[in-house]
Amino acid sequence: MNYTESSPLAESTAIGFTPELGSITPVPSNETTCENWREIHHLVFHVANVFFAIGLVLPTTLHLHMILLRGMLTIGCTLYIVWATLYRCALDIMIWNSVFLGINVLHLSYLLYKKRPVKIEKELKGIYQRLFEPLRVPPDLFKRLTGQFCMIQTLKKGQAYAAEDKTSVDDRLSILLKGKMKVSYRGHFLHNIYPCAFIDSPEFRSTQMHKGEKFQVTIIADDNCRFLCWSRERLTYFLESEPFLYEVFRYLIGKDITNKLYSLNDPTLNDKTIKKLDHQLSLCTQLSMLEMRNSIVSTSDSEDGLHQFLRGTSSVSSLYVPSPHQRASAKMKPIEEGVEDDDEVFEPETPNTFKVRQLP
């Protein structure tokens, strides 16, 4: 009788598995491994994912975008922890979401701390609302500016803030908070300084690149005055680290100089009129006032420039031509101001900027 004896290897091949893997059930290649899907998770799981989705689709243009995003992620992580603990009993899911929750809570707390209302001293609130707030300086940045390297000082009526040819211009920059100051040159009255105005802005601008200069005018308190005073050197270093605030100061000082020059043209201006002087003057008027200021600051020892100015101009729009005999002082650099526009305060300077140059 003829018969063929089958080998164990052939039998193993016929049934589709090897002897070592005899316990594994073969899976056809045309079927998925997920034959039985699990049931839908609890509602808490889906609500958590809804909060995640809301946080991710929040537009970045919202003012509180980051706070809302962190808030949504915090709620989502909390619901995930509840779901993993009560309905899934998954320790690893609970631990990971606890870590994520802690990170989001810390970041959310930091964002809320930054958004806290900053309290500005009552005495400084006036200059903030008048000068800095319209230029969108944040309250916290203003508080940093006024909380360091500056102090509030007092002058009684008749006391001098600066004396011509005696007081150095390198020490400080000040804004008048209360009272009124009178500016004179060799006994001749020039103009008044009112609250929320810089006291020594022309000297600050004209001597930025020079050291050891002296005031060319005398500034005396006409009332009991209080003023905010910065150390000039430390203020300069601070503004170098804050480019935005540097541009703000550059604009404010330039505009303050313009107002002072306008006061030179019309000494009868009072505080209320100065407050209304927010519109830009014509080019002709600004050039006229800059020439007049240079005639005072950069005059020689003779008083020709002062007397010529005191004789005045018939119109604020008439251009003042300095005397050909006038010489620039070696001590004070003439003020050269470009014509600025409120809408282009923070625009880069163009090569076509108008400047006033002293005639030889």
Curated annotation (Swiss-Prot):
It is a multi-pass membrane protein. Residues 337-347 have a biased composition (Acidic residues). Residues 70, 114-360 are cytoplasmic. Residues 325-360 are annotated as: Disordered. The modification Phosphoserine is found at S295, S318. Residues 350-360 have a biased composition (Polar residues). GO terms for cellular component: bicellular tight junction; caveola; lateral plasma membrane; membrane; plasma membrane; sarcolemma. Pfam families: POPDC1-3. GO terms for biological process: epithelial cell-cell adhesion; heart development; positive regulation of locomotion; positive regulation of receptor recycling; regulation of cell shape; regulation of GTPase activity; regulation of membrane potential; response to ischemia. Residues 93-115 are annotated as: Required for interaction with CAV3. Residues 136-186 are annotated as: Required for interaction with KCNK2. Its main location: membrane. SUPFAM superfamilies: cAMP-binding domain-like. The keyword Transmembrane applies. Keywords: cAMP, cAMP-binding, Cell adhesion, Cell junction, Cell membrane, Developmental protein, Glycoprotein, Membrane, Nucleotide-binding, Phosphoprotein, Tight junction, Transmembrane, Transmembrane helix. It is found in: Lateral cell membrane; Cell junction, Tight junction; Membrane; Cell membrane, Sarcolemma. Residues 1-48, 92 are extracellular. Glycans are attached at N2, N30. Coiled coil: none annotated. The chain crosses the membrane at residues 49-69, 71-91, 93-113. It comes from the Eukaryota. Belongs to the popeye family. Homodimer. Homodimerization requires the C-terminus cytoplasmic region. Interacts (via the C-terminus cytoplasmic tail) with TJP1. Interacts (via the C-terminus cytoplasmic tail) with ARHGEF25/GEFT (via the DH domain). Interacts (via the C-terminus cytoplasmic tail) with VAMP3. Interacts with KCNK2; the interaction enhances KCNK2 surface expression. Interacts with CAV3. Cell adhesion molecule involved in the establishment and/or maintenance of cell integrity. Involved in the formation and regulation of the tight junction (TJ) paracellular permeability barrier in epithelial cells. Plays a role in VAMP3-mediated vesicular transport and recycling of different receptor molecules through its interaction with VAMP3. Plays a role in the regulation of cell shape and movement by modulating the Rho-family GTPase activity through its interaction with ARHGEF25/GEFT. Induces primordial adhesive contact and aggregation of epithelial cells in a Ca(2+)-independent manner. This is Popeye domain-containing protein 1. The gene is POPDC1.
